[in-house]
Amino acid sequence: MATLFTVARPSSLLYVSSINPSKTFSPSISLKLNSLSFSFGYRPKPLRFSKIRSSLPSESESESDLDASAVTDEWGEKPGDANEPDSQPDNVTVNVITDEWGEKSGPELEESGTRFMESDPPRNEDEWGGEIGGETEADAGNGSAVSDPTWELKRCLADSVYGTELGFKAGSEVRAEVLELVNQLEALNPTPAPLENPELLDGNWVLLYTAFSELIPLLAAGSTPLLKVKSISQSIDTNNLIIDNSTTLSSPFADFSFSATASFEVRSPSRIEVSFKEGTLKPPVIKSSVDLPESVGVFGQQISLSLLKQSLNPLQDVAANISRALSGQPPLKLPFPGNRGSSWLLTTYLDKDLRISRGDGGLFVLAREGSSLLEL
């Protein structure tokens, strides 16, 4: 460094002391007001360095020293809490859950294997606290659960046909609704081969609804003021291959019943060929008392029948005598001519409560006698 301040012709203002190479060179400058001079002095200043320690462990440090060093987070706290247990059971797994900020939530203990062995299974409850699909649900009279979708469809079908006089008074909207429900039930048919399940097919079936055009005159007669269609039913006997259709008409004075007996042949597991043989007209059942309504509707006008009812009371004894006389008479049988009584019947839905059949362009919805569907 001394060579930087050496000049060929030193000025008298510049005084350079002799330089000892063995000493540390430290320049100093002094400025006087009268003259400008530079002086260089040798003031050794030892260099001091702060102690630098590497963050990496040296080979001399043992593993125990590394384990003893504490690692802290940004708040100066240790991640391991002193209150946490030192060890966990063998059958317990600790799940550390962090939130969206990276902070730990409370650990959840999950037992392996038999966590729910001693606890009850979770209950499936609705918003009112009731179990869904449990054993506590109310069952229908036929043993079907109310929440069963098939039972709900059957209940809706029974509600839709109620008050339609077996379909005679059903409007276009009701007919469309009934047809839609029938299609849904047919898609869920639990018995695709009804003729192979006689325990379900056999028995007495009560008509709920029909769209069969040949029954319209009969249903129209039941819409008269003093005559009602009391019931239309069908009895099936697969052992003897016999079907019996029965109709009962009710009047204030008597009940009239007639039936049609047919034999059938099995064409497929769900279809039969029906051949009607004869019709039977049973003797009327005379009522012990005249059962007149209070009024009847004729052309939109309500006509009172109270006076007629009072005048017929003396005739009740005569009606009882006629009933006893006719009760012992045999039924009148009428054969069907030719093949006019032939038809076919296809069962598209069958269970222990409901049967849906189609035949000759007609639709028949029937409920088993004694079913809860008849009470809806």
Curated annotation (Swiss-Prot):
Transit peptide stretch: 1-53
Polar residues composition bias: residue spans: 85-96
Pfam families: PAP_fibrillin
InterPro entries reported for this sequence: PAP, PAP/fibrillin_dom
Biased composition (Basic and acidic residues): 117-126
Cellular component GO terms held in the UniProt record: chloroplast; chloroplast thylakoid; chloroplast thylakoid membrane; endoplasmic reticulum; plastid; plastoglobule; thylakoid
Disulfide bond positions: none
Protein localization: Plastid, Chloroplast, Plastoglobule
Leader peptide range in chain numbering: none
Main location class: plastid
Region (Disordered) residue spans: 54-146
Alphabetically ordered keywords of this record: Chloroplast, Plastid, Transit peptide
Function of the protein: Probably involved in light/cold stress-related jasmonate (JA) biosynthesis.
Protein family membership: Belongs to the PAP/fibrillin family.
Miscellaneous section: Simultaneous down-regulation of PAP1, PAP2 and PAP3 leads to impaired long-term acclimation to environmental constraint, namely photooxidative stress imposed by high light combined with cold.
Protein name: Probable plastid-lipid-associated protein 3, chloroplastic
Organism of origin: Arabidopsis thaliana
